[in-house]
């Protein structure tokens, strides 16, 4: 059987991994074996956190809406219930944005929610 030589492919694969590990500390950016583990783990964290990011942002929006609603004398849950009853369909992302940057509009929304309760 002829000898199989894969030096070119191995070199390319190693270069690709080391390029991905650029900026890592110590051996993680220089030694292929360590870099491969670091890059693999980083990929797992990235995959997991892309999903967690959605939950984290929703929690942030809710915290902001709750804080603004309480300044207007209403809890978060009662505000959302009131908005649903007033058939105001506005998602939490936009509602949080309004609460932070346009307090007058948010106050109007709170008043409409209070009236619908």
Curated annotation (Swiss-Prot):
One Pfam entry name: Ribosomal_L20
Assigned GO CC terms: ribonucleoprotein complex; ribosome
Keywords, comma-separated and alphabetical: Ribonucleoprotein, Ribosomal protein, RNA-binding, rRNA-binding
Coiled coil region boundaries: none
GO molecular function, one term: rRNA binding
Ribonucleoprotein as UniProt keyword: yes
One BP term from GO: translation
Entry-linked Gene3D superfamilies: 6.10.160.10, Ribosomal protein L20 (1.10.1900.20)
SUPFAM superfamilies in the record: Ribosomal protein L20
Its biological purpose: Binds directly to 23S ribosomal RNA and is necessary for the in vitro assembly process of the 50S ribosomal subunit. It is not involved in the protein synthesizing functions of that subunit.
NCBIfam families cross-referenced by the UniProt entry: rplT_bact
UniProt family annotation: Belongs to the bacterial ribosomal protein bL20 family.
Protein name per the record: Large ribosomal subunit protein bL20
Species classification: Bacteria, Pseudomonadati, Pseudomonadota, Gammaproteobacteria, Vibrionales
């Amino acid at each position: 059987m002829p000898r199989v030589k894969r030096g070119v492919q191995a070199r390319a694969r190693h270069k690709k991994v080391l390029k991905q590990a650029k900026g890592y500390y110590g051996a993680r950016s220089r030694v292929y074996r360590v870099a491969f583990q670091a890059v693999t783990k980083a990929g797992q964290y990235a995959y997991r956190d892309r999903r967690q990011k959605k939950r984290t942002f929703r929690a942030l929006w809710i915290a902001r809406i709750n804080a603004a609603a309480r300044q207007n004398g209403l809890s978060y849950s009662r505000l959302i219930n009131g908005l649903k009853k007033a058939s105001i369909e506005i998602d939490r992302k936009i509602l949080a944005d309004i609460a932070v940057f346009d307090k007058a509009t948010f106050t109007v929304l709170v008043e409409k929610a209070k009236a619908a309760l």
